[in-house]
Amino acid sequence: MPSRAEDYEVLYTIGTGSYGRCQKIRRKSDGKILVWKELDYGSMTEAEKQMLVSEVNLLRELKHPNIVRYYDRIIDRTNTTLYIVMEYCEGGDLASVITKGTKERQYLDEEFVLRVMTQLTLALKECHRRSDGGHTVLHRDLKPANVFLDGKQNVKLGDFGLARILNHDTSFAKTFVGTPYYMSPEQMNRMSYNEKSDIWSLGCLLYELCALMPPFTAFSQKELAGKIREGKFRRIPYRYSDELNEIITRMLNLKDYHRPSVEEILENPLIADLVADEQRRNLERRGRQLGEPEKSQDSSPVLSELKLKEIQLQERERALKAREERLEQKEQELCVRERLAEDKLARAENLLKNYSLLKERKFLSLASNPELLNLPSSVIKKKVHFSGESKENIMRSENSESQLTSKSKCKDLKKRLHAAQLRAQALSDIEKNYQLKSRQILGMR
């Protein structure tokens, strides 16, 4: 039987946002403390409503220790309100942690930042490489306000897909306010959102945990877009290690294919021990959920170690597959670049050929009319033809008659023509050498 709003008791309102209200509730059947978010779907089209319901159903399938658990959805058709029932995180969100550190002028410990990095990356890995073989889920709105902490300070990633659901031409989309500090360069350039866009947002979040401010700040969205496209930011405070700064810098690479994947982040030596501990704990949780007694786990550490190694092998296989896909993508890009280089070379050869033909025609015209070599340039350029005996026609006829009757000048013209032919041959050799060098340069690229 589907749940109803009457099955829950509202305790108090935690906060409000572009989506509506977030309230702390108690389930009447067992007293479990949860939260729900109210979404007013009254102004949505039927297609958007269907997408909203299917998206929430998909989110219910995400089950991971570092992902906020989605329990149920309740549709109140009378008030055109959708309630999304989720896990309650009593530790608040990372935005409040950053605000507290800013007010107290106190940086967060690197150990805490590394734990956040580890657990968030494991959460993203579950979304990008679904363990149950389901469709890839992209978060699309990873920021401190959407990352929560439980009572033991474990990280819980929440609010999946809600930004994408609401960012349509609906009343909710129009109520969006604020500056998108974590928006990736792909989004700024109106390109498709991908897994590496989540990695960019993760890098921005980790940067803000260290510096207590985003890597890119501005007073307007236009100015911010320019700074993000430029991709320049300060180093995190020097109290943090170079290794942490290096991995955050890699996450904030402008080229998405240069950013590390979730597998590459988890394999980083900086958090390798933390990753192993988290995976061991997750394995123990799965065992308890399957009804395995804790004593049998304690009595057979070899079995649990084998299971852990099996999981690690599966993860490495997935990482290898992802790397193969990236290599194929790079090969395709290289093929495109090679075609462009061949086109450029063909155009260059065509230009050289046309230039050579033009030059040959010029020399042939000079050879057929050797008297043009000794004429002033002003006379050659002027092609004035008037009817009757004008000054120009009289000058040209007198000069040509005097040159044709002079044998000594004719010999001189032949010598000059021979010298011009030699120069043409030398120029042709230089052009061939230049053509060879240009091909070598294009081959190096």
From Swiss-Prot:
Region (Leucine-zipper): 306-334
Phenotypic consequence of T179A: Loss of kinase activity
Impact upon substituting T175A: Kinase activity decreased by two fold
GO cellular component annotations of the record: centrosome; ciliary basal body; cilium; condensed nuclear chromosome; cytoplasm; cytosol; intercellular bridge; kinetochore
UniProt keyword Hydrolase, yes or no: no
Stated regulation of activity: Isoform 1 is inhibited by ionizing radiation in the presence of PPP1CA. Its catalytic activity is inhibited by the inhibitor CCT241950. In the presence of this inhibitor, displays an autoinhibited conformation: Tyr-70 side chain points into the active site, interacts with the activation loop, and blocks the alphaC helix.
Outcome reported for the amino acid change (mutating T170A): No effect on kinase activity
Residue ranges, annotated region (Required for microtubule binding and for localization to the centrosomes): 333-370
Domain Protein kinase: 8-271
Any one GO biological process: spindle assembly
Positions annotated to bind ATP: I14, G15, T16, G17, S18, Y19, G20, R21, C22, K37
Post-translational modification: Activated by autophosphorylation. Protein phosphatase 1 represses autophosphorylation and activation of isoform 1 by dephosphorylation. Phosphorylation by STK3/MST2 is necessary for its localization to the centrosome.
Family membership: Belongs to the protein kinase superfamily. NEK Ser/Thr protein kinase family. NIMA subfamily.
Protein name in the entry: Serine/threonine-protein kinase Nek2
Gene encoding the protein: NEK2
